């Protein structure tokens, strides 16, 4: 008899730690931001349930059995969970909808039943992630040596998230950075980056032919840009040199022909003198020698000139010979004396 009780005690000692371990085990539950998540309770005998109390940082809700044909009744005890919690029958699984980042954390469910062990505790850890968008592949380093494209590819998501892993196919490389040594024989390959977190995954691809084309185009663009800059520089130097030589020429011309000189006066207004010249016609004496047939006298006007030029007036004055003078000799048979001009400027 004593031996029988000893075997029962040993059996209880073996099963108690196992039951305690089950109660203290933490289940990880992953949820997606803005969507719903389910906490699995999985009660084997729903009719034995009296009440389930849910707590987190604060009290969350408690669940009581409904009628035989209705779902369990949920009473929310914290305002942050209003209209976002319901329970599924018949296993009393708890559902939280419209997940927020602040919902993440530890949760505990105390399950009270009518039979032994009367109270069972289950623990959960809720992790919330964003659904990943399409990753982006960028070329962070490019080089081309001996017809080989050496490219460093970087794969990234729009918002850096926790627990995001990257994988490259067909190479099977892990990590968001991939170093490629592309040869002409491998131009038909396509590299695919897959970003993944515990709740979602997405991918993007790029062809090897596109990589090498982008490298060649990049070098051509760089070379063309450099030539354009050099051409603009030489054009600017040519323009500045032309302006400098022109100004130097004008300065030297001003030194050779200073302002006020006859050349400058004539160059600026070659018709100014003719507009201000007055001619006087005077008959010369018959005894005037042929060598002295014309006499020019130039008289300069005052330096102060009127602002507006007056019209040119020509005055002719004729002098008649006296009646007592005889006829001229044969040598003087030419027209009576040549006219003499008096020029007034």
From Swiss-Prot:
Span list, region Disordered: 326-345
MF terms (GO), sorted A to Z: identical protein binding
Gene Ontology, cellular component aspect: external side of plasma membrane; intracellular membrane-bounded organelle; plasma membrane
UniProt keyword Nucleotide-binding, yes or no: no
Location in the cell: Cell membrane
Compositionally biased intervals (Polar residues): 328-345
Protein name: SLAM family member 5
Gene source species: Homo sapiens (Human)
Taxonomic lineage from the root: Eukaryota, Metazoa, Chordata, Craniata, Vertebrata
Gene name per UniProt: CD84
């Amino acid at each position: 008899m004593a031996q029988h009780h000893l075997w029962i005690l040993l059996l209880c000692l073996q099963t108690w730690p196992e039951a305690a371990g089950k109660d203290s085990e933490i289940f990880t539950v992953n949820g997606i931001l803005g969507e719903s998540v389910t906490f699995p309770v999985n009660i084997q005998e729903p009719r034995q349930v009296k009440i389930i109390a849910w707590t987190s940082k604060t009290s969350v809700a408690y669940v009581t059995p409904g009628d035989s044909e209705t779902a369990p009744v949920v009473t929310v005890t914290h305002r942050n969970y209003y209209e976002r919690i319901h329970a599924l029958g018949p296993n009393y699984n708890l559902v939280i909808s419209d997940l927020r980042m602040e919902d993440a954390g530890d949760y505990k469910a105390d399950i009270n039943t009518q039979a032994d062990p009367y109270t069972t505790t289950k623990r959960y850890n809720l992790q919330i992630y964003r659904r990943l968008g399409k990753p982006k592949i960028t070329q962070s380093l490019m080089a081309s040596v001996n017809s080989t494209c050496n490219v460093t590819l970087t794969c990234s998501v729009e918002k850096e998230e926790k627990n995001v892993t990257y994988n490259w196919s067909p190479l099977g490389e892990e990590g968001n950075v991939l170093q490629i040594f592309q040869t002409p024989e491998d131009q038909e390959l396509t590299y695919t980056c897959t970003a993944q977190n515990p709740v979602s995954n997405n991918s993007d691809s790029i062809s090897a032919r596109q990589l090498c084309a982008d490298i060649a185009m990049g070098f051509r663009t760089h070379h063309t840009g450099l030539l354009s800059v050099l051409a603009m520089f030489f054009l600017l130097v040519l323009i500045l040199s032309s302006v400098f030589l022109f100004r130097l020429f004008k300065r030297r011309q001003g030194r050779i022909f200073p302002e006020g000189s006859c050349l400058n006066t004539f160059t600026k207004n070659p018709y100014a003198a003719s507009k201000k010249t007055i001619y006087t016609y005077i008959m010369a004496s018959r005894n005037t020698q042929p060598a002295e047939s014309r006499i020019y006298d130039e008289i300069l006007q005052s330096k102060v000139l009127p602002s507006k030029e007056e019209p040119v007036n020509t005055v002719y004055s004729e002098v008649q010979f006296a009646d007592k003078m005889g006829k001229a000799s044969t040598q003087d048979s030419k027209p009576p004396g040549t006219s003499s001009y008096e020029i007034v400027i």
